A protein has these predicted regions:
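Metal-cofactor-dependent catalytic cores
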Residues: 2-421
Length: 421
């Protein structure tokens, strides 16, 4: 039986003795349930385990007790795994050729252990420090549109076309899609493209496909208002860090923040939208979120592109079901070559979120509150390694090469235990 994560809501507006008693009772019950769930989880063996989250966001309970008001938005019920995920399928595939720039929705994509084909294969760096620039710092990056044009008959197998908003007055340029070794031998090599101040990734400074005209670096520098370079990932392997669930993880990536793939579900997105809407409509002190535009977010409506996933799934009917998947097989509708091993994706950790999803992908403007501050109200404590961070989606790796298509079926091969991956 499928039991939704989020299905009970209450809102009391009185600070009377009755409300105070009710709030204290709820806290006591939540504590008892938490203790019982810990004992039950440890007693389970194998794939069948029990996962529970706090009865409601701790900070909301704290506010309730201080003000004598019961004002919890979400009451989380027990979820027993394994559960029936129904006819869950891939509903969207998103490729982001240049890190932090606009993504492209595709119906199918080849993949390798380093991610979807051409996903985050390029990035933009500071010319002097070689720090990788993201939309966390420069929100208008999301308005740069990279477009892959594949042409097997072309010298470089096609090209990456990069265009800009019309009002920027920056001209469109192209770079080789798969430059030959002879070609890149003339490109400057950067051995220390820096990510988060610790990852040093190798890359080539790209030259334009058309020799006449300005270089990609010159055009992008105009857009950014400072000296920058477009860089293509070099051959040196960039290893991924270990996770709490996989301390011996051996995986590599290109210019992704952490891991080759990000998996998320439409049900999770809908739940985030519902909670955003509830906060936007609540005008009580306990429902206040600083900077939220109540009129704009009254109906929720945040889009999945803000979270920059690669593989979006739909069908389980359970928000955040992906939190409890350890391994999934993405199986094609029609029989094709390839083994389950190359189709098995391991979800190695939850994806902790920064302010980047606050950037509107259509305007390049960062919202003051949504979704980050809302996620911080009910999605913290999910990642055992970073309990203070809010989570949405799961990072994943794969052991081989293959093709993923919209409509492919999701099968859970192994379930996570405790609080999930």
């Amino acid at each position: 039986m499928v039991v939704p994560f989020f299905d009970q809501h209450w809102h009391a507006q009185s600070s009377s003795t009755l409300s105070w008693s009710l709030a204290v009772l709820l806290v006591s019950l939540a504590g008892a349930l938490w203790t019982w769930s810990r004992t039950t989880s440890r007693a389970k063996i194998g794939a069948a385990a029990v996962s529970r989250a706090p009865a409601c966001p701790p900070e909301l309970l704290k506010d309730d007790l201080q003000g004598g008001v019961a004002n919890a938005y979400t009451f989380e019920r027990e979820i027993t795994v394994p559960f029936d995920i129904g006819d869950t399928r891939v509903s969207k595939i998103l490729v982001h050729p240049i890190k932090s720039c606009r993504g492209t929705s595709v119906t199918e994509s080849r993949y390798s252990p380093e991610g979807l084909e051409n996903d985050r294969r390029w990035c933009i760096i500071e010319a002097e420090s070689h720090a990788i620039i993201t939309a966390r710092e420069v929100a208008k990056m999301v308005l740069i549109t990279p477009h892959i044009e594949v042409d097997p008959a072309a010298p470089h197998g096609g090209r990456l076309v990069v265009s800009f908003p019309e009002d920027s007055e920056c001209e469109t340029f192209s770079v080789p899609l798969h430059p030959s070794q002879d070609t890149v031998s003339d490109w400057p090599v950067i051995d220390d493209c820096t990510m988060f101040g610790k990852y040093l990734v190798q890359g080539y400074v790209c030259a334009a496909l058309e020799p006449e005209g300005r270089s990609p670096s010159e055009i992008l520098s105009d857009y950014f208002g400072r000296s920058v370079h477009l860089v293509m990932k070099g051959p040196r392997v960039r290893p991924c860090g270990p996770t709490e669930a996989f301390p011996e993880l051996k995986a590599s990536a290109v210019f992704q923040d952490g891991y080759p793939f990000l998996v998320a579900s439409e049900e999770s997105l809908e739940e985030v939208g519902r909670v955003i809407s509830r906060f936007a409509q609540d005008e009580t002190p306990q429902g206040r979120i600083g900077g939220i535009d109540r009129e704009r977010w009254r109906d929720g409506g945040v889009n999945i592109e803000r979270f920059r996933p690669n593989i979006v799934v739909k069908g389980s009917g359970v928000p955040f079901a992906e939190d409890m998947w350890r391994q999934i097989v993405i199986r094609p509708n029609e029989p094709t070559k390839g083994s389950d091993e190359t189709r098995t994706f391991t979800l190695v950790s939850k994806c902790t979120r920064c302010l980047l999803p606050n950037v509107d992908t259509t305007t390049g403007v960062r919202d003051a509150a949504v979704p980050y501050k809302v996620l911080m109200k009910f999605r913290t404590g999910k990642d055992p390694a970073r309990k203070s961070k809010a989570c949405f989606g799961c990072n994943a790796v794969v052991g081989g090469e293959g093709v993923v298509r919209v409509g492919d079926r999701i099968e859970v091969k192994e379930w996570a235990t405790g609080i999930g991956v």
